[in-house]
């Protein structure tokens, strides 16, 4: 059952709401416009608040639904977390869009909502505070994502390895942003 759910999670994660909504609305392809990221923040820049919110909600659900399905199937928390990681992998490397996806932050937040809601609240709160103070989405993601690790190590240690892998994937996807942050070239809102 685990492998079937992991595959379904990857396929669901491969649905890029940013790309689909940009095509349906006639907005620029987020992979080749703005920041080049197929995610909610770039959709806000390119297509406005409404499509950005729809992208965010879709990406959150892509992370949440596979975890809830894994729980309903009776998988333990460790397996649920790996199923969620597969959904994020689908978002990062979508099968349907030549493996050119987003950075996985919203999908990871949805996954955390299903695994351990307090960790999701911590990450979302840290993201919002950092973004409010710096107006920099990438910095907010890079601060918020690793903050969940100590809480999960304490409260849900069986999810720690998958969440550590998830954190590494998100940091890796932000490597260009890290270079731009250090060089003072990162985009701000």
Swiss-Prot record:
The broad enzyme category this protein falls into is transferase
GO molecular function terms attached to this record: acyl-phosphate glycerol-3-phosphate acyltransferase activity
Q: Which UniProt keywords apply?
A: Cell inner membrane, Cell membrane, Lipid biosynthesis, Lipid metabolism, Membrane, Phospholipid biosynthesis, Phospholipid metabolism, Transferase, Transmembrane, Transmembrane helix
Q: Does the keyword GTP-binding apply?
A: no
Give an example GO cellular component term for this record: plasma membrane
Catalytic activity reported: an acyl phosphate + sn-glycerol 3-phosphate = a 1-acyl-sn-glycero-3-phosphate + phosphate
Q: Which residues cross the membrane?
A: 1-21, 50-70, 77-97, 111-131, 151-171
Q: Which InterPro entries match?
A: G3P_acylTferase_PlsY
Q: In what pathway does it function? A: Lipid metabolism; phospholipid metabolism
EC nos: 2.3.1.275
Keyword check for Zinc: no
Name of a matching Pfam family = G3P_acyltransf
Per its UniProt record, what SMART domains does this chain match? G3P_acyltransf
Q: What does this protein do?
A: Catalyzes the transfer of an acyl group from acyl-phosphate (acyl-PO(4)) to glycerol-3-phosphate (G3P) to form lysophosphatidic acid (LPA). This enzyme utilizes acyl-phosphate as fatty acyl donor, but not acyl-CoA or acyl-ACP.
User: Subunit structure, per the record?
Assistant: Probably interacts with PlsX.
Spell out the protein name for this chain.
Answer: Glycerol-3-phosphate acyltransferase
* This protein's encoding gene: plsY
């Amino acid at each position: 059952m685990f492998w079937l759910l992991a595959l379904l999670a990857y396929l669901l994660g491969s649905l890029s709401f940013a790309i689909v909504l940009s095509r349906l609305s006639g907005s620029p392809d987020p992979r080749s416009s703005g920041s080049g990221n197929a995610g909610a923040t770039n959709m806000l820049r390119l297509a406005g608040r409404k499509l950005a919110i729809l992208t965010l909600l879709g990406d959150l659900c892509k992370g949440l639904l596979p975890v809830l399905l894994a729980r309903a199937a009776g998988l333990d928390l460790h397996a649920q977390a790996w199923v969620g990681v597969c959904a994020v992998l689908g978002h990062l490397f979508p099968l349907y869009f030549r493996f050119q996806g987003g950075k996985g932050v919203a999908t990871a937040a949805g996954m955390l909502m299903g695994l351990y809601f307090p960790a999701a609240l911590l990450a979302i709160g840290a993201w919002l505070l950092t973004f409010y103070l710096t107006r920099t989405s990438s910095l907010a993601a890079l601060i918020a994502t690793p903050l969940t690790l100590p809480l999960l190590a304490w409260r849900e240690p069986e999810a720690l390895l998958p969440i550590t892998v998830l954190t590494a994937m998100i940091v890796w996807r932000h490597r260009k942003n890290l270079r731009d942050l250090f060089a003072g070239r990162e985009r701000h809102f």
